[in-house]
């Protein structure tokens, strides 16, 4: 391995040369407390910045061993360190001058949720931080003097302050670790307490705005109805009380603007841990919960939707259904079946974003259009079977139909952001307004059919590499999806994707599956099972192919991996 003095000598040797000469810097160099690696050098000062990583041995970093004891605590520490490093580099970014992205220093920006990111990874031996630096230039002429400032003056200070335990705020870090342990404890108690979600008293659910996930100031704190209040004992916070949502079918109702969707939004993001001060730190949902909605125009391939749709006029087989342009009802049926395959134990639905004809058929409509002429079995007629036979609970926001009141186990009315348990009151009313007997066909578990097709690589038609296979490239469109090769994967309605870095990771996972796992025999479920094992064992690093993985990727849940792969048109 070269020494840091070798890096200085290289910098002096490339100073004022043409920008591509920076490529000579690629390699690893030991500094006092860490090893600096220049993994990828940008092509010019206006291109995406260079990829840098540093490795700090645990002995040097000095963090307590108990902070590495399990995956959740390790992820919390990684998240904390990435946030601390970002706080340090903000003082130095663009302090080195030049053209284009010269002087940029950046790392993943962590939001309100705690995610496992490639920006900071903890292994058995070391802490690895990955970030970006814009190598300075004047025009397209190397300015190595400015890069030397970044690597030898700015960076060592940032590393010392962010990644050495002796320089961190011990109390703040311990509070983050303790919060994560308390959140894990609540998740465990959901299962043992026959609950699907918990919302602590005092939680702040409304957000600052539609483009901000920070808590709204002066909003109404959440207070549980007495009949749904549960008390949990946590290892650090001690006793905490709040609303426990039982397994089964839960209905959330209330007038417009009273907080129904706000509660549902908090529950759908309760699959993630939140940082202290977010207001939703103790809003915890079963981590397999899946938000579902209709998605007009969605691609569907070989999905068994016969649980909900049968006897189509064109005689199309709904046990292995495909379409390039799904209707709202068909897309929602497919989403539920795909969610079952992904192992979801809770479905979250909002009437506002659901297909009306998929959710319910009222008595009058049943009289006008007889059952034998209607191919759709509405969700209303399957929700109880989903719980009793498949052990999948439902939380539904509703406001326009009486029908769901008759099958709900728990009914919560939101009244000026205050939840009220009206279950008993509604049961008394249901006797006055009886529902027609359900005539749905027998419940049968859907069967997975979809085989992932092996894709022949495109062949370059011109240039010096003509005749060689083209590399499958990915272009990420924020949280909305990505372009892989020439195909768009649309993820706009996968609502529990919260960070563009998760979308980027999904692109890498799909690319790996296409190139390494698709063989015209494995199903999507088979492929995701292989990927899941790799992710659990090696994290996202296994996607590097023996090279390196950069900053800019965050771990998606298994449910979002399924959602992504099922939207890929192969």
Q: Where do the language-model regions lie?
A:
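Terminal-proximal interaction/regulatory segments of ATP-powered molecular machines
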Residues: 490-570
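Conserved P-loop NTPase
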Residues: 414-503
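Glycine-rich phosphate-binding P-loop
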Residues: 240-272
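Flexible beta-alpha connector loops of hexameric P-loop NTPases
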Residues: 298, 311-329, 361-376
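N-terminal pre-Walker A segment at the start of P-loop NTPase domains
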Residues: 206-241, 276, 284-289, 293-300, ...
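N-terminal accessory targeting/assembly segments
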Residues: 1-185, 189-194, 205
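Conserved P-loop NTPase nucleotide-binding/switch module
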Residues: 340-383, 387, 400-406, 410-428
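Phosphate-binding/switch loop-helix module in NTP-utilizing enzymes
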Residues: 320-354
